[in-house]
């Protein structure tokens, strides 16, 4: 048994990096895009995993809020209007996406306080 090593290991089914990290977003594709995009000369192994996790979290957060907005409007399909309402009503997402225009999103309903009718007290 000289020079033979410890015996051949049988490799199981290939596991993607997204599976290993427990993510839905494609780690391999993000790694490729980071390398091709000339962001840096070299890209570490953990960078695409971290970026995929952040992107997945943000997408889930926006979809959760947009789904709630759709349900509030008694709709089963998320439309750009629901995305707009979800993002603009959330303080942190609004700050993050302040420079983004959503096509067909409309505007937030807002009436200035001075334009509202004055409440008068009735004396009994």
UniProtKB/Swiss-Prot annotation:
Family of this protein: Belongs to the histone H2A family.
- Tell me the superkingdom of the source: Eukaryota
Where N-acetylserine occurs, the residues are 2
Identify the taxonomic lineage of the organism of origin: Eukaryota, Metazoa, Ecdysozoa, Arthropoda, Hexapoda
Q: Which PANTHER family match?
A: HISTONE H2A
Which UniProt keywords are present, listed alphabetically?
Acetylation, Chromosome, DNA-binding, Isopeptide bond, Methylation, Nucleosome core, Nucleus, Phosphoprotein, Ubl conjugation
What positions are modified (N5-methylglutamine)? Answer: 104
Name-wise, this protein is Histone H2A
* Organism annotation: Drosophila melanogaster (Fruit fly)
Record text on subunit structure and interactions: The nucleosome is a histone octamer containing two molecules each of H2A, H2B, H3 and H4 assembled in one H3-H4 heterotetramer and two H2A-H2B heterodimers. The octamer wraps approximately 147 bp of DNA.
């Amino acid at each position: 048994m000289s020079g033979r090593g410890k015996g051949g290991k049988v490799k199981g089914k290939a596991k993607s990096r997204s599976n290993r990290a427990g993510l839905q977003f494609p780690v391999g594709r993000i790694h490729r895009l980071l390398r091709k995009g000339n962001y840096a000369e070299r890209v570490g192994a953990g960078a695409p995993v971290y970026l995929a996790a952040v992107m997945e979290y943000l997408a889930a957060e926006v979809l959760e809020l947009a789904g709630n907005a759709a349900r509030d409007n008694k709709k089963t399909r998320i439309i750009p209007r629901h995305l707009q309402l979800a993002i603009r009503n959330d303080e942190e997402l609004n700050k993050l996406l302040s420079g983004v225009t959503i096509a067909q999103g409309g505007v937030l309903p807002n009436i200035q306080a001075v334009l509202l009718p004055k409440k008068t007290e009735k004396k009994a």
